[in-house]
UniProtKB/Swiss-Prot annotation:
UniProt entry keywords in alphabetical sequence: Cell membrane, Cell wall biogenesis/degradation, Membrane, Transmembrane, Transmembrane helix
Protein name: Casparian strip membrane protein 1
GO CC annotations, alphabetized: plasma membrane
Organismal lineage: Eukaryota, Viridiplantae, Streptophyta, Embryophyta, Tracheophyta
Record topological domains on the Extracellular side: 71-100, 155-186
Length: 212
């Protein structure tokens, strides 16, 4: 009777010691994993934001180069001070289809770069956004062959203007049209710089999409 009364009064219930230790020892790895993930997240965001800033600066430089190339070529014209009754010696960019294509291609590239600036800023503000970054990657990749083709076609004409072709009896005209050749040569150089900047932009977007 005494033993049963003492058991009811105290209400002692045996608790297994091993289960309490295992339940208390489980949480620390979970806490450590959460701390590791939260530490990694700001680091990745910082890298992506830095790549976004580089992307924005490169686009500003590419805009300047593309518009400079299109403007220099589109305003190129030279007329020699001497002419005859039947002939007028004048060189104009639209006399050659390659130069016309050059102006159109670089103007399109410059317009696209201007329109892409808001999306580049969006990638800086929201570094983990994928849609805008993927869209920029696709259009930048399309712009690379467009600008490269225009610059290469114009470069071949500039080479003939400087050196001529004896097999085809094409004479070099840059001795007479010196100003014309200097302007178109500068435009071609600016266009190749634009193409190079587009290649770098594609690489930056690819790295930003790959970084996790």
């Amino acid at each position: 009777m005494d033993s049963s009364n003492s058991t009811k009064e105290t209400g002692d219930i045996p608790i297994p010691v091993t289960s309490s230790k295992s339940s208390k020892a489980a949480p620390p790895p979970v806490v450590a994993a959460k701390a590791k993930s939260t530490t990694k997240q700001p680091l990745v965001s910082g890298w992506k934001r830095g790549l976004g800033i580089i992307d924005f600066i490169l686009r500003i430089c590419a805009i300047a180069a593309a518009l400079a190339a299109a403007t220099a070529m589109g305003t190129t014209s030279q007329q020699l001070p001497f002419f005859t009754q039947f002939f007028q010696f004048k060189a104009d960019y639209n006399d050659l289809p390659a130069f016309t294509f050059f102006v159109i291609a670089n103007a399109m590239a410059g317009a696209y770069l201007v329109l892409s600036l808001p999306f580049s800023i969006l990638c800086i503000v929201r570094p983990h956004i994928l849609g805008a970054r993927l869209m920029l990657l696709v259009f930048d990749t399309v712009a690379v062959p467009l600008v490269t083709a225009a610059a290469s076609a114009a470069a071949s004409i500039v080479y003939l203007a400087h050196n001529g072709n004896s097999d085809a009896n094409w004479v070099a005209i840059c001795r007479q049209f010196n100003d014309f050749c200097q302007r178109v040569s500068g435009a071609v150089v600016a266009s190749f710089i634009t193409a190079l900047l587009f290649v770098v932009l594609v690489a930056v977007s690819a790295v930003a999409l790959r970084q996790k």
